[in-house]
Amino acid sequence: MFTIETKQMDIIIENVCNEKAKDLFYQMLINYEIYKTMAEMLDENMKKLNFYNFAKTQTCHMNDGLFGELEYAEYQFVYQMKVIGNLIVLITSAHRIMTCIKQARANEKCKDWRIVSEEIEKCDKIFDNKLRNFMEHLEEKVYKQEVTNQNCHFSPQRILYCKDEKTDKQFDFNNEQLKMIDNLIDNILKMLSARKEKRGNLSHMEC
């Protein structure tokens, strides 16, 4: 039932010597499960939101009546809130994943990390502190009525726009873009698996 997850855990157990790094890899996998769940929910909720956006533009009083139009507007609002909630959790979990990865690399100091260094840098620029902080404090800003469509909104094309005194950022949450985290973790696990073949070369692993 949990074949993939079990295999991922085994790779870490068998190929990571540094105990602190091992704990960080476990935390990475926990946050990755959250990330994957949010990515699926986000995709589903965006599809529903776009459906109701389209339905509202096509409605008319003759067929649906005033209450039909209001019903579509309510669905729009509900799914907008769901998408924002999904984005907050997804971005936070991705930032935690990147933090775990960078700290694990710092603890291990292994040369094989060079294989994924460019991927780490690219993902780190996307899921940076500014984006994470903006989304984490979004609920508070909404409560204080400090957020408008100019500060935070997203498009049907799945682009999130964030702007305040500290942040001016666009975040692409299309499925292909979100797979960057999947690809990074997959390549890190491949990197760890390759250590089994090089176990005799202690200078390579430095552990």
Feature locations, PLM:
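Short linear, low-complexity motifs centered on an aromatic residue
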Residues: Y143-R158
